[in-house]
Amino acid sequence: MKKTNFTFMAFASGKESTKDNAVKRYTGVAPVFVLAVNPNKAELEKLYNTQLENDPEYLGEVEVGGDKHKVQNVRLDFIVKTDAGKCGGIEFTTKVAFFIRKEYRYNRDQTKVQVIDKYGRTAWVTVEQAKAHEIPVYKNGPANIDKDYRPAYHGEEELTNFIKAYLNIPNVMKYVNNTWVMVDKPEDCEARLESIAEYFKGNFKELRDVIALQPNNKVKVLFGVRTTDDNKQYQAVYNQMFLKNNITDYSKLDADLQERKAAGAYPTTEFTVGDLKEYDVESTDLSNSGAVGDMPFPAGDTAGGTPWDFGK
């Protein structure tokens, strides 16, 4: 019998198998430290223990409004790290990002502008009221804001709320005898950024100085996972509300999240209002995924002869 030897191999050498380098994602509420604000390339490489090709770009432009006019925009990245001791051993570094536009925030028909006072409180007033520094009166009474207010930049409210929670700044009002009154030392409650115009020039000293006031403080952040149309997943942050580190009741945070999601916000992001945990996508059960007839070719035990049947 004729003996036939065949060499049937066309493989590259491949790579040595190593440990799984899949990036983990997390959901839940976690206390975090703030490590840096808008760091440069060298600082980012040290924070993330990696090498970067390009310098980070924090300044840009966005098109807004029906007329698509361009407005200068700045991204503010607060690099944060979870407190592993309070997160079941989970430790990771990520960022909380804010976007500030170089324009004041108006309502849709441009009849009202958002204003912010020196205690970080906001309200909506008419343009005429803003010019006169009037306190607007709502159905339930006057707005909870001081006359010393100014127009707020688009995105400033969320940024201010983050800083107030991080610095653990108290409320300027207290409830006494069924009435809200100002605290005895309102100066301890001041919380307003005054150099935002400098951010659009690349000067972030004010923010770095603010964080340095309490370098060991923590703020609680709600993390989630965002899924893109091509099924890629990214770590996300709910930046509409932040909690002081001593807060353990998350009901207001959950209510705020549900209200915004009901209005159409965060449609592709999954949040879990609770303890921080690793995000786990349920695996698909392929053991009974279809009958043999659904396959593009016959099953192994019923298949015909292979076209490479060299034994014949």
Question: What are these model-predicted stretches?
Answer:
Residues M1-K312:
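Short beta-rich binding modules
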